[in-house]
Amino acid sequence: TSESTAAADQNSAAAESSSESAGGEGAKKVLRFGQANAGDGLDMQTSTSSRAASIADEVTESLLRFDDDNNEEPVLITDFPTVSDDGLTYSFELKQGVHFTNGTELTSKDVKFTFERMFTPATAAKSTAYFNMIKGAQDMLAGSATELAGFEIVDDYHFNITLEYPFAPFVKNIGTSYADIFPEDACTEAGENWGLGT
């Protein structure tokens, strides 16, 4: 009947509206996360807030992460890095086909950018102590170098990080929020607003 058809049309329209508001096709891509005090932004290079980290961990990734048993597992890399016999050089292979939310594919240049940004004096990163054993980090922090001497890009998916001295916790440290990887283009474009904007 025409009444049952009209009711079906109303139900269909309500379902479509509900689908859009619940994240269906055509919905805005917004993450809402309740937090009493989120700290001073989501850029974990410039923040030490555990509250900010709890949010940042929902939208950014480091090369490794800790599982529920506090064991590390690869996230953005295919496996744990191989380490040279002298304990100085770590060789990484990125997973292929990983994309940032802006659609760009993760490559070695984004990882290099992230670590170099950390040691750039203008960033005023609070997390450098976790990584300042990387060769050339101290020179960048002092402003006498603009590139990280210990970071070598092999190709889009392979890179090496060389340390000044053996440092056993290095692999653990790259699994923290302080080593979340940023897309170079988007981060550069956002400038000082990185981690603050909507």
What are these regions (language model features)?
Residues 26-30, 58, 75-77, 85-89, ...:
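Extracytoplasmic
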Residues 64, 68, 85, 99, ...:
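Sec-exported extracytoplasmic/periplasmic mature domains
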Residues 163-198:
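Gly/Pro-rich hinge or "lid" segments in bacterial periplasmic/extracellular proteins
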Residues 34-85:
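N-terminal lobe/hinge region of extracytoplasmic solute-binding protein
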Residues 79-130, 160:
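Aromatic- and charge-enriched surface segment that lines or borders ligand/interaction sites
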Residues 1-30, 189-190:
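Short, low-complexity disordered leader/linker segments with a strong preference
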Residues 1, 5, 33, 63, ...:
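Residue-level signal for nonpolar/aromatic packing positions in well-ordered secondary structure
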Residues 54, 58, 62, 71, ...:
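Extracytoplasmic/secreted proteins, especially bacterial periplasmic and envelope-associated proteins
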